[in-house]
Swiss-Prot record:
It comes from the Bacteria. This is Small ribosomal subunit protein bS16. Residues 81-104 have a biased composition (Basic and acidic residues). The keyword Ribosomal protein applies. InterPro entries: Ribosomal_bS16, Ribosomal_bS16_CS, Ribosomal_bS16_dom_sf. It comes from Prochlorococcus marinus (strain NATL2A). NCBIfam families: S16.
Amino acid sequence: MIKLRLKRFGKKRETSFRLVACNSTSRRDGRPLQELGFYNPRTKETRLDTEALRTRLGQGAQPTDAVRTLLEKGGLLEKKVRPAEVLGKQKQEKERSAKKKDAAASETSE
């Protein structure tokens, strides 16, 4: 399976990443099949080869979570609602409804 992942490079404590397509069993800094972009987390600079990325995604390449976030910001993928976000929202809604019930109960008892 082909994965889209970040390949680390740069100086110590001044890292940058290349967005690469590679085999899922290869090492993080191993030889990639293709370089598809660049990301610098310090300056927030992002460069993406959109044609090559669309081709790889069309072939069934699976992006990692970090790469998916970059692609969503770049407009290549639709924003996906992750289960943790949904569970967090549901939990917040339950807490809000419980507070409303407690407030209503305390008002009626006074």
